[in-house]
């Protein structure tokens, strides 16, 4: 990993270059066949290989009493990306489609991301936030080259005065490539409020306040199958949660030392 930084007045310029390995999950490698629906089977491919991912990130940061801004430009390349693959077969004298995986040619994504925080009173009383990005995704596999746009957008407002506080966060979902499908971001419409007295905090949370929870996905373009899914949970609009917490460490000196950082990047994911 390469990291270079140049300090500016009220900000900085940073250049990062990183690389990593993406390992296939155990379910991606398993030859066990499962029935999704009659006529559609799902099976892993033990011949799928791990892929390498690398690319540069250029980031600009600005910070003063009223404004915090971060803008990034990036380009990430993945060789032999793991992508879905479909073919026809005969199971118990019936024609069926098998959904499996293969190593495609490449996956290339590039674009820009941004985050803006504005404090009109130059303190924590009121904060306005917006963030998002514009990303171009290019995937090349057995079915040709596919190009998509991903443009997430999120926003929020925080209020804090004395012992009271409240916030609201929302977003506009956009679809991005996730292994098998192009999946939409999870919709977000969350409200929270709290009152804090010493170590005690009393909270109220509301999720999906103005819209139901909605999850969408669509298979990549291919000549064999077009699969679209949509799940809507309307009851979540009435979800409210009350919370009471006590901080036993409030006002106490904390001295924590981290001795071990053990991370298993090759952990399997059973489905």
Place the predicted regions along the sequence by residue.
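Outer membrane beta-barrel strand-and-loop segments of large Gram-negative receptors
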Residues: 43-45, 49, 62, 68-130, ...
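C-terminal beta-signal and adjacent terminal beta-strands/loops
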Residues: 197-271
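Surface-exposed extracellular loop regions of Gram-negative outer-membrane beta-barrel proteins
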Residues: 9-54, 75-94, 211-226
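Outer-membrane beta-barrel proteins
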Residues: 22-28, 69, 78-86, 125-127, ...
